[in-house]
Amino acid sequence: MALRRFLRTSPITSTAQPAPLYDNQDIQDIVGAYARPWQSRFGDITITTTSAPVWSGRYPSVAARNIIVNTILGAHLNAFSGGVIAQYRGLTWRDNIMSSLAPPSQNPPPPAWVPAENVQLDSDNYPQYALNLSKMWSVNLDVHIMTMWALSDYGPLYEISVPTAPMPAMTTAALMAYIGCSITQLAMTAYQYAGQLPQTAAATMTTTLRWLAAIWFGSLCGVVHRNHTVNGFYFDFGKPGFNPDHAVLKWNDGNRAAPPAAARFRVYRVRSPHWQQMTSEVAGAILAQSVTAVAGLTAMFNNRGLPVWAQNIPHFTGAAAGTRVSRTYNPVTMAAARHQNWQAAGLITAVKQAELDQQYTDYAQAIEVHLTAQLAANPVANGRMPIQPFLPADFAAAGGTNQVVADARLMFP
């Protein structure tokens, strides 16, 4: 396999907050077992909220530990962008084959280690990459996920794409094996696959996960459901009132969506802070990010709507033609659109729709109360931020939910 180049970027901390955003216990938490922090992120999305927005004191939201992990990785990945120099008994060298082996004129003191932020990372500058490709693959996955979170000041960015060609037979067969699995289980599967060994963009499993992410997105919008499936597949929200986070892949031999008139791909993120306590949103993003970690992004992101620190990053963001503007949505207005689409399709009655809307609003309100309390309990000045800072008005920010749902209709006509 030819050597592949990976470009990434690390997070930036709040300008009002003293760096770093973590403490020594956070570091111990992510290095407490083998292979950590690489390929351990899946354990952070196994928590089920069952509509109760609680977790732990140190990581008070579903997304909290991922945020901390991203910050730690980003702050200490200077070596990924500049190489590592080893020193022993008066000799210095790089990598396992001792490139640049030389005796220095004098033994220099160890350099001062300064955690960095907003660092551009390039695997071409990392001497271990070519020699340890299998080991670097899991690093690439986690750093890619870190980048998709680092480029956003709201929810993490993720890409959804749907081709004009029908779903391949091998993909259909592969998806059959996942019927009955929840979005969280499927995100874990995608994460483990993408980080185990070097994969290709055209591999059957990569294609399967790409379709799976698209089916999840269509189901989230309420456009894909049991009466309008993607080759028979859809996600069923079996407990929309009790646990809106619970969605399971199912199959139904009924009406199926036609291929889109043209290949579709868009970039999305959640606008409101609710995503930090929603297992389904975190899992859905990681599922889609596991695909782009292997296959690469279809196009660069447009600067519009992105924070200043995420603009004009080579190979990622810019204002040129062909870049994609990230579209945002609010989970509350998205749930209302989903219920409306169910009602229009005859899946539920108008009375049930109103009931589900109210239940989801209550669920979101509980999350708002919880996150607001956690923000107050963890002020920026403390130097450790286990949740992403937000403004009270952010909860009501609708974003472009209607436009996002319209995208889903074009993807799955």
Swiss-Prot record:
Alphabetic keyword roster: Capsid protein, Intermediate capsid protein, Virion
Any GO CC annotation of this UniProt entry: viral intermediate capsid
Cell compartment(s), UniProt: Virion
Main subcellular localisation: virion
The keyword Cytoplasm belongs to this UniProt entry's keyword annotation: no
Subunit structure: Interacts with capsid proteins VP3, VP4 and VP7.
Family according to the record: Belongs to the reoviridae clamp protein family.
Job description of the protein: Located at the interface of the incomplete T=13 outer capsid and the pseudo T=2 inner capsid, 120 VP6 subunits clamp and stabilize the inner capsid shell.
Record protein name field: Clamp protein VP6
Native organism: Aquareovirus G (isolate American grass carp/USA/PB01-155/-) (AQRV-G)
